[in-house]
Amino acid sequence: TEELQPSFTEGAAVFHPRYLQVGEDQVPLLLVRSKIGLVNAASAVTEAISYSSNCLGVISAGTAGGLARGINVGDVLIGENYTYTDADATAFGYARGQVPGMPESYDGQADEWQDALEHALAALEPVREQAESPWEVRRGQMLAGNSFVTAHNVKDTREAFEGAISTDMETTAIAQVCHNYEIPFIGVRCVSDLCGPEADQDFHLSVDVVAPRSARYALQLAAELWTEAQLEALDLAL
């Protein structure tokens, strides 16, 4: 990416206006680095949305803890829906993870992104296959909360959220903000740690490895979304 404007800090986040070169186009991006936690992430994405009069969508990149069995460190995870690990109003008839008055989970409203996502995954498949240690790409429910999922509570978390593949401390908060603003959202995370590793599994991979991998997928998706948007605009013009 190339600098569009100087970076600046607002609240709990640093904002980096950038251009992403896609063919002959320079795609405007606002890269945001928030601090850790649900409130910090929600504050950052709300601020970011306020800077754009035409936001195509939000992509959350970063690291995550692998939750589902069979996931390994280094795997790339694509969110299909998002909920909270530590929201519990079940005593009042709500589902585990559901905030009262809000949906059980957030689907990201990104159904229209499926073609762009498939193109992005296909474009990066040769990179994945030729890697010294190929990783898997998995899709499913992503969890987020203010508490870590560890060996002490991983069994309960897996039972409560059977389809969940990962947990972190930001994704669902971003999904909720995007839901409120009716902006498409998707989480793209790379597994740095395992919440409940098996005896023969590596359970940690350096952030210097996993963060760039997540970013690569996120930027490829952004490029595909821009290309798709330009083609749709051309069709409308015709």
Q: At which residue positions do the language-model features occur?
A:
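Mid-sequence, gly/pro-rich, charge-dense loop/helix-turn segments that line enzyme active sites
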Residues: 67-162
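A C-terminal functional module that forms or caps the active site or interfaces directly
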Residues: 145-200
